[in-house]
Curated annotation (Swiss-Prot):
Family from the record: Belongs to the UPF0349 family.
HAMAP family given in the database record: UPF0349
Pfam families hit by this protein: DUF1450
Name of the protein this chain belongs to: UPF0349 protein BCG9842_B0165
Xref: InterPro entries: DUF1450 (IPR009910), UPF0349 (IPR022916)
């Protein structure tokens, strides 16, 4: 089964999204990856974000980011 891919930028992890990565990694239905740079420096500077199946998902806080990731997945099922 193909799992949704959640990608994090290491620079954004240092800015606070590390907690979101750790929460999402606990979900066995997700593939969570960490990369050196995803090339979204402007968005990265603004606050917590992740790529969800290639689409930018942001949150004002870590909790909001996690909720927005799950909301995005609910609204955009893979199958």
């Amino acid at each position: 089964m193909i799992k949704p891919l959640i990608e994090f930028c290491v620079g954004n992890l240092a800015s606070g999204s590390q907690a979101a990565l750790e929460k999402l990694e606990k979900d066995p239905n997700l593939d969570v990856m960490e990369y050196g740079c995803l090339g979204y420096c402007g968005i990265c500077f603004e606050g917590p974000f992740a790529l969800v199946n290639g689409e930018v998902v942001q949150g004002a806080t870590v909790e909001e980011l996690v909720n927005n990731v799950y909301d995005y997945l609910d609204e955009n099922p893979m199958f």
